[in-house]
Amino acid sequence: MRRPVVKDEIVEFMRHRQEQVTGSLKELENFARKENIPIIPHETVAYFRFLMETIQPKNILEIGAAIGFSALLMAQHAPEAKITTIDRNPEMIGFAKENFAKFDTRQQITLLEGDAVDVLSTLTETYDFVFMDSAKSKYIVFLPEILKHLKVGGVVVLDDIFQGGDIAKDIMEVRRGQRTIYRGLQRLFDATLDNPGLTASLVPLGDGILMLRKNQAEIELPDVD
């Protein structure tokens, strides 16, 4: 994300001081930078590396494959995991297919094509880790279905939820073109941050991460229609 919410010097320290990616991930990182394709920044990469090696999830769902960088990162650090990733952008799907064919050596990753709203309703499996990195205004729309497919004790990570700092402002201070995202994120926070069925944490990495842990089988959420 190009709008970090932490001081620039701290961001630079985190990006340069923590272990760098190598091999296939470095190749994809360089490609994304050259083509100006958003992928998770290095401070988030380091955090994901820690999460994967600590949690060791067995069944991962990702919303937003892009070029496949984050799915391949998770596969590398959770080698026993099966990963299902969803994307609807034809160009990104093309990149992801190429990269999975080249770098997914353990054949851990399955790519599903289509709008997440439609694809989620067809899933029959349960997951212990979900990564959402797609349309921010739709996070609250996707969440009910995500939670249905999440095991008790499972974790959801939602990326880029600070909107470059806009979420801390009054809506009248937010540019008109960003207000739909703003409203969607505020509804997301209202539904999750004080929800007794969830443990929630806001983490200032990149443009912000929301982490959720599912604590009980049934989670009540406000109507999102």
Could you say what each language-model-derived stretch is?
Residues 1-131, 136-157, 161-225:
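A short alpha-helical cap/connector motif
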